[in-house]
């Protein structure tokens, strides 16, 4: 009995709370703990089923009478950037991405704090302290990386190191893709569209690693905060019948792909 309870994940349901994305609605989540030697394997399995990771917790929406949150993953090797996205990549050609272990730094927190203060001042993460940030980065029992984005310097070509930190993405490496857990950027660099740039960079990284997907989290039709995730096509969206393909034309394939 003890062995069974240790190896079998236990799931819990949160109490209803106001939905941060759709006004007038309430959200509930089902969650479990990601701990132990099989945390990575469980995280892969749950991500395929529409869960997201936050520290050592895997969760997914379980709202009463609402299924607006739809898990999306970009098909990396088929993705072709649009004309505007190609311009954006060219605009940010002076940025170098550096993959690191998930170790929090004061430099990261400074950018993170500026991002929250300007972009999400009244959000649920607005009061996060430096210790809260450290927990967000370090509390992972799966294969996690921190991708730092820095401006190139005259020495970058020699050292491989960039200069000023302007963005970062906490990213899980799954068996079939990259999952963007949380990303943030310097708000004074708004002209760079760094949020879009980081997604495009992750698609390129997944392709180089031979990984088929980039998991973006939840797309919510009608939510301005989440609508952008539908722009990266082709992609797959999780339906009750399985993952459904959305072509570059925006048309949905009727058959699940998995």
UniProtKB/Swiss-Prot annotation:
One of its GO terms (cellular component) is cytoplasm. It catalyses: N-terminal L-glutamyl-[protein] + L-leucyl-tRNA(Leu) = N-terminal L-leucyl-L-glutamyl-[protein] + tRNA(Leu) + H(+); N-terminal L-aspartyl-[protein] + L-leucyl-tRNA(Leu) = N-terminal L-leucyl-L-aspartyl-[protein] + tRNA(Leu) + H(+). It is found in: Cytoplasm. GO terms for biological process: ubiquitin-dependent protein catabolic process via the N-end rule pathway. InterPro entries: Acyl_CoA_acyltransferase (IPR016181), Asp_Glu_LeuTrfase (IPR017138), N-end_Aminoacyl_Trfase (IPR030700), N-end_Aminoacyl_Trfase_C (IPR007472), N-end_Aminoacyl_Trfase_N (IPR007471). Its main location: cytoplasm. Keywords: Acyltransferase, Cytoplasm, Transferase. GO terms for molecular function: arginyl-tRNA--protein transferase activity; leucyl-tRNA--protein transferase activity. Its EC number is 2.3.2.29. HAMAP family: Bpt. Functions in the N-end rule pathway of protein degradation where it conjugates Leu from its aminoacyl-tRNA to the N-termini of proteins containing an N-terminal aspartate or glutamate. Belongs to the R-transferase family. Bpt subfamily. This is Aspartate/glutamate leucyltransferase. It comes from Rhodopseudomonas palustris (strain ATCC BAA-98 / CGA009).
């Amino acid at each position: 009995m003890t062995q069974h309870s240790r190896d079998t994940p236990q799931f819990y349901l949160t109490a209803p709370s106001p939905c941060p994305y759709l006004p007038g609605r309430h959200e509930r989540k089902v969650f479990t703990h990601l701990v132990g030697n099989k945390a990575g394997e469980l995280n892969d399995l749950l991500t395929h089923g529409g869960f997201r990771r936050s520290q050592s917790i895997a969760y997914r929406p379980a709202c009463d009478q609402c299924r607006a949150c739809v898990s999306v993953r970009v098909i990396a090797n088929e993705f072709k950037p649009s004309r505007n996205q190609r311009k954006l990549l060219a605009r940010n050609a002076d940025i170098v991405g550096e993959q690191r272990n998930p170790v929090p730094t004061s430099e990261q927190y400074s950018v993170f704090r500026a991002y929250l203060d300007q972009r999400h001042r009244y959000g649920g993460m607005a009061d996060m302290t430096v210790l809260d940030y450290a927990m967000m980065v370090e509390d992972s029992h799966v294969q996690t990386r921190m991708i730092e984005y820095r401006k190139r310097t005259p020495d970058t070509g020699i050292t491989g190191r960039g200069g000023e930190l302007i963005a970062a993405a906490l990213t899980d490496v799954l068996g079939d893709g990259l999952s963007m857990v949380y990303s943030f950027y310097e708000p004074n660099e708004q002209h760079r569209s760094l949020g879009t740039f980081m997604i495009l960079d992750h698609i390129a990284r997944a392709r180089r690693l031979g990984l088929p997907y980039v998991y973006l989290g939840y797309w919510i039709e009608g939510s301005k905060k989440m609508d952008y995730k539908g722009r990266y096509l082709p992609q797959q969206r999780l339906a009750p019948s399985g993952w459904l393909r959305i072509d570059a034309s925006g048309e949905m394939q009727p058959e699940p792909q998995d």
